[in-house]
UniProtKB/Swiss-Prot annotation:
Biological process terms in GO annotation: acrosome assembly; acrosome reaction
Protein name: Golgi-associated RAB2 interactor protein 1B
Gene: GARIN1B
Main location: Golgi
Its job: RAB2B effector protein required for accurate acrosome formation and normal male fertility. In complex with RAB2A/RAB2B, seems to suppress excessive vesicle trafficking during acrosome formation.
Keyword Cytoplasm: no
One cellular component (GO) term of this entry: Golgi apparatus
Amino acid sequence: MLSSFPHRKTWRKSKKTVKVTRSYPTFPSLNAWEEFRGLLPVDGEPNPGAGLGVEEGLLCRVVHSPEFNLFLDSVVFESNFIQVKRGRNWRDVYKASNTMALGVTSSVPCLPLPNILLMASVKWHQGQNQTWNRPSIAPNIFLKRILPLRFVELQVCDHYQRILQLRTVTEKIYYLKLHPDHPETVFHFWIRLVQILQKGLSITTKDPRILVTHCLVPKNCSSPSGDSKLVQKKLQASQPSESLIQLMTKGESEALSQIFADLHQQNQLSFRSSRKVETNKNSSGKDSSREDSIPCTCDLRWRASFTYGEWERENPSGLQPLSLLSTLAASTGPQLAPPIGNSI
């Protein structure tokens, strides 16, 4: 028998579970930004510097080996050269199996420019292919020189033959011809390095978060900003002479001591001219004591603006930018090969 009551509908709604996915912005890591800027090699791709034979070579391995254990955190920019001697025609000094590895590095990795020169003689085995990146049989390499770059003069001697001239502080001159297995791009790197060592860099930091608090090139080179012109006008009153400025740009301690002596002498003369001559011994004693107490560093703010920066100092102070050695071969692709004859 059927029921006369209609079927009641349940008014309760069934609960449904809804999954809500929140999307958060993802930021790339620091290494990703560095790879985007071309400063680090992308995973799976070879290091362009190592491919050209200017990084991670034999000289770098010898210096970083447990035998020497030097400059472990610094990049070594190096190339393979053949020592030649000058004459009517360039002639090799040693046999073809003997080459020379020349490189530069930084004693402290935070320095923006290199300050150490490395030289090593390489003796290859008979019939061995002179591949300096990863040779099948390691050649005999002997580290000959570790010199501060401030005591070394490096310049391009023959652009067509790809020959560099290296002069040490003892007047020893080396003529080094770039190994023929190196591409033309590598010699342009050395030309650029010579220009950097002679004139400095206007921009020397890879990381924009690092603030450069010192000048890396002399103010008298070229500066389009108006603030530098005002600084130069203020500095003209305190500059002793043009010869002193030239000595000062060298960054030598003898030149600086001479500058301090000249400044102290000028302060003494100006102080004496402003004071009347007194015959009293006591007053003269007071004057001499005042003259001796004149500080020499009161108007030496202009001194730092004419030096080449902290990279010449053995013990740098303050916040330093990262090393720029790897940026010589940081870019990838065919952009590394500029046309022959054009300077970098």
